[in-house]
A protein has these predicted regions:
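Short, surface-exposed ligand- or partner-binding patches at beta-edge/loop junctions that are enriched
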Residues: 71
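Rhodanese-like catalytic fold shared by cysteine-dependent sulfurtransferases
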Residues: 1-29, 36-67, 76-127
Length: 127
C-alpha cells in the first residue's frame, strides 16, 4: 500500500491482493463506483455499488473501524471519488490501484455472468 498526505487527509493506494486479504479479514468495505451496467456484468463479490455519476460523500457508511476502499474499472474514477471524499472532510480514504482490470489480472475471484444462462456465477481464474 502506498500512502500520501493530501491536505491533511491520508490517501491510500491499495494493490488488489491487499484489498482481497483485508476484505477476507473483514477489515475494509469495498465500494465499486462503476455504472450499474458494469457492476451487473461483473463485480467483486461483496462490493457495494455507489456509481460515480450519483456519488455523494455524505451518503457513505461510517468508517469507524473499517476503511473504505473505492474501485472502478481502471482506477481513474475511484481516485476522483476518493479526492471528492477528502475535499468533503474525510481524513482517511483509499482506492484500489488499477481498478477491476488489475483485480482480474491478479487472478482474483469475482462474480460474472454465465453466458449460457445469464445468471451470476463466481469466476475463479486460474494461474
Amino acid at each position: 500500500m502506498q500512502t500520501e498526505t493530501v491536505g491533511g487527509a491520508v490517501f491510500e493506494q491499495w494493490e488488489p491482493a491487499e484489498v482481497r486479504a483485508a476484505f477476507d479479514r473483514h477489515e475494509v468495505v469495498i465500494i465499486d463506483v462503476r455504472t450499474p451496467q458494469e457492476y451487473a456484468f461483473e463485480h467483486i463479490e461483496g462490493a457495494l455499488l455507489a456509481p460515480m455519476a450519483m456519488f455523494k460523500p455524505q451518503n457513505l457508511p461510517s468508517q469507524e473501524g473499517k476503511p473504505i476502499v473505492f474501485h472502478c474499472g481502471s482506477g481513474v474514477r475511484s481516485r476522483r471519488v476518493a479526492e471528492a471524499c477528502m475535499e468533503a472532510g474525510f481524513t482517511r480514504i483509499a482506492h484500489m490501484t488499477g481498478g477491476f482490470t488489475a483485480w482480474k489480472e491478479a487472478k482474483l475471484p469475482y462474480v460474472g455472468i454465465n453466458p449460457a444462462t445469464g445468471a451470476p456465477r463466481v469466476v475463479e481464474p486460474t494461474t
